């Protein structure tokens, strides 16, 4: 890549990047559909990856009124909270990498489609809450990914130009959001393949953080 702006800030998605939560989310969606007596589409999981629950519901079930979509999203969040009590597991290498960034005083943020309640729980359980300068959640934005709002707010909170930020993302819609925001992206292959993430705009992809160091 030519004429790259020197990187100054780093932004992480949460689910599938900091925490290996995919199985909990898949099971929560399945439990939600069972509870309301609906059959999910075969590719339901891929449709929901990286999106706020309210927006994902509207894509999964045609013709829902806004209040009903919100109710189903609340059901999904309830099931996810129950399942997440089984334990929170970081993606391999995350604690060491984030600690190294903190020691190096690299501006760092989390920008997620999860609620603030879920984010706070995850970061506290991982022992990482104090390691992030800025967190932006679904509660803080009007538009979910692939809209760039969550990433632009994170960059503004860090006081770093978007072009000087690199994002770690596991979702195609998240990669698209970060690219529209003008940021560089490295894919994390916990939900999509490396080829899928690169086609969406990631410059490369990694399986986890065990071999990642700063500058990336």
Per-range role (PLM):
Residues 1-8, 99-102, 106, 115-216:
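Asp-based, Mg2+/Mn2+-dependent phosphohydrolase catalytic module
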Residues 3-106, 117:
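N-terminal helical cap/lid subdomain that shapes the substrate entry/recognition surface
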Residues 13, 17, 112, 170:
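Conserved G/P- and acidic residue-centered "switch" motifs that form tight phosphate/ATP-binding loops
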């Amino acid at each position: 890549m030519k004429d790259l702006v020197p990187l100054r800030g780093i932004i992480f998605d949460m689910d599938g990047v900091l925490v290996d939560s995919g199985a909990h989310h898949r099971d929560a969606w399945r439990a939600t559909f069972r509870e309301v007596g609906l059959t999910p589409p075969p590719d339901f999981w891929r449709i929901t990856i990286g999106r706020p629950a309210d927006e994902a519901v509207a894509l999964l079930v045609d013709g829902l009124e806004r209040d009903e979509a919100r109710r189903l999203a609340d059901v999904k969040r309830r099931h996810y909270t129950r399942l997440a009590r089984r334990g929170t597991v970081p993606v391999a290498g995350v604690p060491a990498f984030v600690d190294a960034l903190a020691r190096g005083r690299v501006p760092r943020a989390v920008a997620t489609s999860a609620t603030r309640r879920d984010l706070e729980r995850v970061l506290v359980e991982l022992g990482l809450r104090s390691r992030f300068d800025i967190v932006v959640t679904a509660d803080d934005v009007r538009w979910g990914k692939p809209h760039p709002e969550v990433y632009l707010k994170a960059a503004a909170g860090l006081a770093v130009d978007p072009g000087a930020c690199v994002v770690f993302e596991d979702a195609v819609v998240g990669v698209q959001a970060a690219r529209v925001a003008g940021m560089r992206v490295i894919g994390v292959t916990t939900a999509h393949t490396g080829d899928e993430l690169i086609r969406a705009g990631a410059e490369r992809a990694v399986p986890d953080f065990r071999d990642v160091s700063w500058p990336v």
